[in-house]
Amino acid sequence: MVEVSGLAVVTVPMFVRENFGDDGVEKWLSKLEPDVREIYKSSISVNKWFDIQKVFIRPTELLCNLFYKGDFKAAWQFGRFSADYGLRGVLRVFVKMGSVNYFIRRASVVIPNYYTPMTMEVPTNEKGFAVLQIPHFPGIHRLVEYRIGGWMERALEITGKSKELSVEMTKSLADGDDCTEYQVRWS
């Protein structure tokens, strides 16, 4: 079974509340399966693991349908929000201390802490350009790929070390490619 960390799950209702208010949260919660609704209404442990389909993908799909006219690219914004949440306080200072290349190396270790089983590799990491790949993630969904891309984009912005930053997803396991690939460019 593929699982998602509570650290990723806890940010979903936070994102809804910040962007659509309490009414948006209630509208979203009312459409969830009862057992999933109870998870989201409770205090979510960031150390707990959840079934990715039931507790993460379907609720995120619902968010996209309710508030973004079904556009899965909204998950990119969820990822950005998650980076702001996860990289705050002392971690934000730590992120700002390293170079972009250092952070990209670390991202390949950090991101797999959100999803299991998965692997992430960095086959290219040079000045101004890097490639990150996910060669193994059983049943990955496009929503997860977008969320990871948005997380990386925002995390790299937080470093404050790059200008003209772009993160582009160039391959997709969900679409049948041999890996999910992100190309990162900066100056």
Task: Identify the role of each PLM range.
Residues 1-69:
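N-terminal leader/assembly segments
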Residues 46-147, 164-165, 171:
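Amphipathic interaction/junction segments at domain boundaries or subunit interfaces
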